């Protein structure tokens, strides 16, 4: 479904050409002798602009002297694409949402040779694939009439930063429910030290205290337990809906909840992508509209597995195109995962009301706030306890909720030994409860251990992925040809570690994993869990609005998806009957192939 806006970010609109704000950035006294001046257009907020000024000034006084380049920065609030035809800048920031359509118009310079022959300190090694593949698209259409984007395509933009989705949660709400919050990476839960008794869950309940200082409280079943939320491990689907249930004020769920609803989650990507689903699936010739596909997905268990000339490794999720081959794979080499339909159904039930508005829609959980924007105000005002948002929410939260929120990763499909839930009576959501670690169910002690394949030891987990907004640096095709070498020298520096240290000061996740997953980046959060943002960015993907040359194909069905299906006014079957055929036709006519995308 389509992204509905960001509160603040490095964003390009399509509004007033040439509008400017916050002035030029010609700091540092002008170019020195031997420096060639280039123009750099970008968009930034007031606080971000100060950082951009510092970055440009640092380059001009340092690497720029060695390169013989002086950057004249210009903070423009909106840049119309027509401005790239006349009086174009030499370097420009472009978001993923605009990138492909502008690239197809021929508005960018192919940077492949620059990167191959003169990379400087910039290298794609150590940068997540989604960063680099997002801004690769061939200049020409192939002989089959399809233009390739992604892996192996022409480099038309260099990744400058990412703004990933994560969950922002209310500390007062969690305290009200007696939840103990820890921040321990999964690899550090090795059965030793302070958290030796803690299992790798995003949220779990324990019969006995799992660590010194943990406080107990009553759970939804009325039992005294130790509730533990680990903001460095994704919750699985059951944990997320249980926690959302805990924070939904209802006589059937929790009449004492401090919030009206549990969560505000507008995007379904984390559910679908975790099990290998998506709203599109490549069938070998074109794309299918696969948002409600009922075919099984597969997790690879064996060390390696060849499917249709593609090599998969243990822990990989099989692509849509290779699922049929996976179904016939040797016994024990794959593990069946939920279908894309299952993922969609779980997501829709979060916001669809119980009973589905008198049976018109899916019988939902009624635990999620239905909102198109999921504005930070819903967290601040006590409507929800968990908010799905890009890091742009931080600006609003720091203004009106400072010190009262923190950050956690998105959901992930994860399987635990003995399952995750039990029922007290009929198998309805009202009667569903999370299993308590240390309790006995059906004469079996529940340990809460992560499930793994018995033969291979492969953990039974899906992908950890959610969407991100990516920004690139490009050289406009119609810029001064004599200045393109100079423009490239600035780009390669800005995308290297030295330049990315400024990007991360704007809270955007830098392109290099070693820098993103570092104490230097975490420290920028001033105690908040910026690890979650960095972690999420490593496996993030572009949203469906940026898959192809424009988002029009999404507009054909997203209105019904968001306004009817998610709100509980139609079922998945009803949605597919009304919108599926048109969406399938629209996607089958797309002439771009996303190479390397799961």
Regions flagged by a language model, labelled:
Residues 168-171, 469-482, 502:
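A bilobed periplasmic-binding-protein/Venus flytrap-type ligand-binding module shared by bacterial periplasmic
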Residues 45-68, 168, 172:
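Short, polar/charged alpha-helical segment
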Residues 96-166, 172, 188-213, 408, ...:
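Hinge/lid segment of periplasmic solute-binding proteins
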Residues 491-518:
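Periplasmic-binding protein-like
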Residues 237, 241-248, 283-372, 398-401, ...:
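Glycine-centered hinge/linker elements that transmit conformational signals in sensory
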Residues 58, 62-141, 176-177, 182, ...:
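Extracytoplasmic "Venus flytrap"/periplasmic binding protein-like
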